[in-house]
Amino acid sequence: MKTVSIFDIYLNKIKLNSKINIQGWVRNRRRSKLGLLFIDLYDGSCLYTMQVVVKDILSNYDSEISKLSVGCSINVFGVLISSIGTKQKYEIQAKVVKVIGIINNPGSYPISSKYHTMKHLRNVPHLRSRTNFFGAVSRVRNYLFNALHEFLFKNGYYWIPSPIITGLNSEGAGDMFKVSILDLNNIPKNKNGKINFKKDFFGKEAFLTVSGQLTLETYACSLSKVYSFGPIFRAENSNTRRHLSEFWMLEVETAFSNLCDIIKFSENMLKYAIGIILDKCVIDINFFRENVDEKIFCRLKDFSSKQFFQIEYKEAINILIKSNRFDHKVMFIGMELSSDHERFLVEEYFKFPLVITNYPKSLKAFYMRVNDDNKTVSAMDVLVPGVGEIIGGSEREERLNVLDRRFFELNLNKEDYWWYRDLRKYGTIPHSGFGLGFERLLSYILGIKNIRDVCPFPRTAYKADF
């Protein structure tokens, strides 16, 4: 007897009156006066449940089946038929029901009722994927992940695994998690009283990466088109709906390319991925239309069909000043755009995805290429409504003398970056790249305001229980 998924059935891959085997968890159950038990079975393959009709004549009906409650797992052998009910298209007439996992105290099951607040579900991330909401998030996340890989593969990019542990801070800033095996109760010290990291595992300070960009550039300077896709870590104690301490980043590096190239490429990539979601995830997107954002289909179709707006940083500042929404006394060329500034621009002024380019070099990292004015860098950020920045990118500084000057200006030791400088010594090339915050993109697509609700096990300050 063939084991099938509920999704296979709704894709019409299974013929009616076929003998099948289906497995999953009880989502709901109800008895009839005719000696029948109706079980709504859920297996995670899609949003739908499958109604299983069980007669009380089965040998284990009284001893096991009648005691089933929400969350119990079962294995059903039966016949697939058209349902005579109006709430479902199919049902299974059960011939055998094997109880796999019972819940002895149904009242203790944390997600037994039909509705729970997000606050409650954030406290049970190990179980919340069993709800419709988080099941749908997980399926869309999977399709989005694969769509991005697919787009890059079709465009000739090679996936390169970037290291999780590093001795450098790619952004030239702090907020990094340290990696150490030193005994916290007996930390070795130097004569000057500082920690002796030579006694540590790597013989020097080591951190969890905040970006794989620098190492990825080494392969861009040989394979031309490369990307990495994996977790990165930031020890920012930012308790906001937009920040996580561990999140996934897609980083793309392209040889012989400029800022215009990566702006166009990143926009095409986003549109391709969202097109896949609209094509492959209709059932789940419709769930979010009914429960989160009623305009989700229109919003995503507009995103896929219309060109992004594009302005320079200085124009963004002028728009903010003229809006009279912000204090003129603290608005000036060279200031950093806050999340409120970004949201005004993308949600109220342009009301559509926006690319901002040519930021002051004082606001950006050492590796971004300095423009001819020596005041700005050839950089870009992509902002989307409801989320803010989802992509940051730039041309990379390929001129060794300019790169060394940036190290000096930012008080960075260029010797720490000796291998990065080698790329400029030996056959340097113009190249560009960008990083995409995966969870932020998923938040935008689904219209979910809190980034913790699109991540299976969100890591934030004081939250690492699982």
Curated annotation (Swiss-Prot):
Family annotation (PROSITE patterns): AA_TRNA_LIGASE_II
Subcellular location(s) of the protein: Cytoplasm
A cellular component annotation (GO) from this entry: cytoplasm
Keywords, sorted A to Z: Aminoacyl-tRNA synthetase, ATP-binding, Cytoplasm, Ligase, Nucleotide-binding, Protein biosynthesis
GO biological process: asparaginyl-tRNA aminoacylation
Superkingdom, natural source: Bacteria
One function term, GO molecular function aspect: ATP binding
Enzyme Commission (EC) number: 6.1.1.22
Pfam families referenced in this protein's UniProt entry, alphabetically: tRNA-synt_2, tRNA_anti-codon
Catalytic activity: tRNA(Asn) + L-asparagine + ATP = L-asparaginyl-tRNA(Asn) + AMP + diphosphate + H(+)
EC category name: ligase
Signal peptide (residue range): none
Keyword Lipid metabolism: no
Similarity remark: Belongs to the class-II aminoacyl-tRNA synthetase family.
Entries under PANTHER family matching the protein: ASPARAGINE--TRNA LIGASE, MITOCHONDRIAL-RELATED, ASPARTYL/LYSYL-TRNA SYNTHETASE
Annotated NCBIfam families: asnS, PRK03932.1
Record's subunit section: Homodimer.
Name used for this protein in its record: Asparagine--tRNA ligase
Organism (species): Buchnera aphidicola subsp. Baizongia pistaciae (strain Bp)
Encoding gene, per UniProt annotation: asnS
